Amino acid sequence: MAVNFPSIDPAQLHPVAGVTLGWAEANIRKPNRKDVLVVSVEEGATVSGVFTENRFCAAPVTVCREHLAKVRAGGAGIRALVVNTGNANAGTGEPGLAHARETCAELARLAGIAPGQVLPFSTGVILEPLPIERLKAGLPAALANRAAANWHDAAQAIMTTDTLPKAASRQVMIDGHTITLTGISKGAGMIKPNMATMLGFLAFDAKVAQPVLDALVKDVADRSFNCITIDGDTSTNDSFILIASGKASLPQIASTDSPAYAALREAVTSVAQALAQLIVRDGEGATKFITVTVEGGKSAAECRQIAYAIGHSPLVKTAFYASDPNLGRILAAIGYAGVADLDVGKIDLYLDDVLVAKAGGRNPAYLEEDGQRVMKQSEIAVRVLLGRGDAQATIWTCDLSHDYVSINADYRS
């Protein structure tokens, strides 16, 4: 079940000028469910993305990279995105690449744009051929359904093992101009940094130069979707896309050194973090949402390395599920994180406000009932103080329950 998942009111998902979304039921894997999404962006928008680091990347990821490379080389801008659920089109070889390109070509034909102006995305079962004819047959309905206010339907259309649609929206003022940001995400399992079995699409109406948007998407991903983990697996299809429609009155942001860029980065990061945290809250079988913060490191990289050792540990995660304050498991994870010169004699460990370990050993004042009180909460903060510098890092994770096994054992049935 989802952990303290916020209620999402479709009416509070602000339309983004220059962006429309439409969906269809194409029976990609199961009948009577939204499983195709088309996102159209008006001419003049800029689009950028980051993708999985899994070497066995899916066919649509390869095609997305190709099309964005052509844009960066001066080609025509991206005008549409197409997403299917139920089938990952991964591990499908040359036929899979042909299907991804055929999807782009068909949507381009219907929309009156070039195939290279389409980005394809797939999510679902790996190693099965994409039912391309069903997907193509669903495109006209998705195009006909397009509307600026369809963000909630769009969030439903990209779900797989998700139990709830994930969306976030906000409006901010930058240099006296209103900027609207709205995004959707999906993902519930195989969540690990770089990036997760996740798709994330975030649009805003600021006008941003292509090189600046390329920098922004990497920066934002590193502060959001690369800070979550559920089971430590990295997917073949991870994709995070930013769309800058350019319809707001704010002058174009052409430099990463400008105050406007800093303000936009803060706003985009806040929405992306909300979308990333929704994925963890809806993690497969999750019953607890856990924030792991490591402070006092020599670098943010080593802090994140230790945080992920804690967040990935099945022993730590099952202890949280059982509300068992077997917190030595956290110390063990810190120790095997791979920070070679770590002085464990300087480490303090907190569970919420409870000091569990001090100077590398059990705090004499620590009572197990205090630890168990925190472990029974649905939201828990783990804080590690390394005592070797000023850097810090935070990740978000969840516990590991019996339901996680059941969901994944039954996924293809």
UniProtKB/Swiss-Prot annotation:
Major localization listed first in the record, in broad terms: cytoplasm
One of the GO BP terms on file: L-arginine biosynthetic process
InterPro entries named among the record's database cross-references: Arg_biosynth_ArgJ, ArgJ-like_dom_sf, ArgJ_beta_C
Reaction(s) this enzyme catalyzes, per UniProt: N(2)-acetyl-L-ornithine + L-glutamate = N-acetyl-L-glutamate + L-ornithine; L-glutamate + acetyl-CoA = N-acetyl-L-glutamate + CoA + H(+)
Amino acids binding substrate: T160, K186, T197, E284, N408, S413
Pathway(s) annotated for this protein in UniProt: Amino-acid biosynthesis; L-arginine biosynthesis; L-ornithine and N-acetyl-L-glutamate from L-glutamate and N(2)-acetyl-L-ornithine (cyclic): step 1/1; Amino-acid biosynthesis; L-arginine biosynthesis; N(2)-acetyl-L-ornithine from L-glutamate: step 1/4
Annotated site (Involved in the stabilization of negative charge on the oxyanion by the formation of the oxyanion hole): T123, G124
Family, as annotated: Belongs to the ArgJ family.
Protein name in the entry: Arginine biosynthesis bifunctional protein ArgJ
Organism: Burkholderia mallei (strain ATCC 23344)
Gene, per the UniProt record: argJ
